[in-house]
Amino acid sequence: MDGIGILGLGIGLGLLIYLSFKGWSMIPTSIAASLAVIITNRMNLWEAFSVSYATSMKNYAGTYLLLFFLGTVFGGLMGESGAAKSIAVKLLNTLGSGKGLLIVVLVSGILSYGGINLFVLLFTIYPIALVLFNNENIPKRLFPAAMLLGSATFSMVGLPGSPAIQNLIPCAVLGTNAYAAPLNGTLVSIVMFALGMFFLVRQQKRLAVAGIGFVPGSRDDLNKIRISQDDDLPHWALSVLPMAVLILFIFFTRNTLDTVYAVNIALSIGIAMVLCLFWKRIENPLNSINESASNSITALLNTSVIVGFGGVVQASSGFASVVDFALSMAMSPLISASLATGIVSAATGSCSGGLQIFLDSLGPKYIELCRAAGIPLEILHRVICLAGAGLDTLPHSGGFITAIVYTQLTAKESYKYVFFTNIVVTSIGCVVSILLFMALGII
């Protein structure tokens, strides 16, 4: 085992967290953190940056460039046209005031369970959340936690039938399906939702007592998000139409088109619909598109360089040692599988990455262990999904970085809330899942 290399991974990750909390840009932060890993793991400096870092970064940027651009344009036009505000007002009138956080969590969960990509979800919900948060004076720093609680916990790996890739990866190896351990997953999802909402509401109240409320970013137009009796807004049903078409297109093409390709087409259709329906309401469409292009590149680049850091980590000897250790733990199959998946997911910053590495390396072995111990593979499926999601949202997580950059927040402002909703809550969910099976036999 490479002790120095493993220590280097810890130093690199610690440096990444420290510098991002100190307000450093993601580019120098990722380079400094990568250097710590490269030096302690005795890697070739040029090869590490030109191959491991650069390849991971460019692959991510190349794959998601159009998605980030189109998603940012769609979200920008929804806000500029008043459609996002119209939807927000309808939600407030239907559910009542004081439900801003609940609305964001529920809508995020519903869209995620419907198969909507996290990035599309962010671009779609943020304009609506701005109106809700401004109207109820909810600190914007709670938005990433609310969105990620809805989209990356119970709806992604808890609820049976979720189309999320994280819930589908185990199927091929374990011979299970998306509905594995339905009662267990449903009960765990209720626990996660309740804990997350309790935490968010409590934090909102604590921030209010401290005098901290909604503060718009430099790109947030108060005139577009402030609710007034004099607002001339499009009808809410018309406003929902572009979103509905976008979501339905992704849903119905999920098995016939590449996911990213389908999302790009859906966003293009959504943009065309917004322009056709609300052209007269958009003051300067070209300016809105140009601003969105700049904003999308900033968000994409900041996320891509963190993925580059992840590429360096995965190429290091320390990472190989961490994976070997995680996959060699001898204890109850459910417990060792959950710990192994969680550790690898934390190292990669990816639930899907952790699941894939675990299943590729030890999937067949754990099938034998579970069968010998009388453990249904359905419960193994559910437990490792929860474990992977429990430790994948560290500060170098791509989803978290994109959320804070796009919303003009900082890790220092937002991460402690995300840490609870997406690491503490999901880890508790994993423990509850294991206990429900071991104590009550609930699958």
List the model feature ranges, each with a label.
Residues 2-9, 13, 40-41, 173, ...:
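Long, contiguous bundles of hydrophobic transmembrane helices that form the permeation core
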Residues 8-20, 31-39, 68-73, 107-112, ...:
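Hydrophobic core segments of alpha-helical transmembrane domains in multi-pass membrane transport
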Residues 23-26, 61-64, 75-85, 112-124, ...:
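Short helix-coil transition sites and intra-membrane helix breaks within transmembrane domains
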Residues 28, 50-85, 110, 259-320, ...:
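Core transmembrane alpha-helical segments of multi-pass membrane transporters/permeases
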Residues 67-70, 94-130, 304-306, 329-368, ...:
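Hydrophobic alpha-helical transmembrane segments of multi-pass integral membrane proteins
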Residues 72, 86-88, 120-132, 161-173, ...:
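Re-entrant/interfacial helical elements at transmembrane boundaries that shape
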Residues 91, 293, 403-424:
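Interfacial loop-to-transmembrane junctions
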Residues 98-111, 138-155, 181-186, 190, ...:
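Alpha-helical transmembrane segments of multi-pass membrane proteins
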